[in-house]
Amino acid sequence: MELSELQGTIRRTYGDRDWSRGLDGTFRWMVEEVGELAKAFRHADHAELTHEVGDILAWLASVASVAGVDLEEAAERYAHGCPTCGNIPCTCPVA
């Protein structure tokens, strides 16, 4: 599935709720899902990890839509490797 297709599907499915909730509320829901992913890491259950990553991806699409950001355009920043050094793999110094 392309990012634009995902964003469109999520917008059609949840867009009215997302707009009613607003950017702040939608972002907070996404952060909750990040917490659920952290719990899934502790359990090391692949199916649970996959589920939570999918939820975060869906919420990120919602946040992007409410903020007026196109996911395809945002992802383009990484299309040719590291946006800082321009290399694949990244050769930036590790902080």
Where are these regions (language model features)?
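Flexible "arm" and connector segments at domain edges
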Residues: 1-53, 57-95
